Amino acid sequence: MAINIEIKDRTENPIYVQVRQQIETHIRNKTVTSGESLPTPAALGQQLSVDKGEIQRAYYELEQLGLINKHTGKDFLGKPKIEYRVK
């Protein structure tokens, strides 16, 4: 899933707040639909050239707001795999 997020350097809001607000807007505007997977924190962090910890914090806050769910499963090698999906 590709979502359009822009990070602004000259703002009072930290990066994780900018990410959270923009994803929240996409969810509320139905740009992303219920059940749709979000990019992993590592993938989105790389796409935006920011630390994945910023994305993890944004996802955590979205989860606390009840907008996304965190799903833990296993990949084809049996390693733990975490997915974030829109509620």
Language-model region placement:
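Extreme N-terminal segment that seeds HTH/winged-HTH DNA-binding domains in transcriptional regulators
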Residues: 1-38, 43, 49
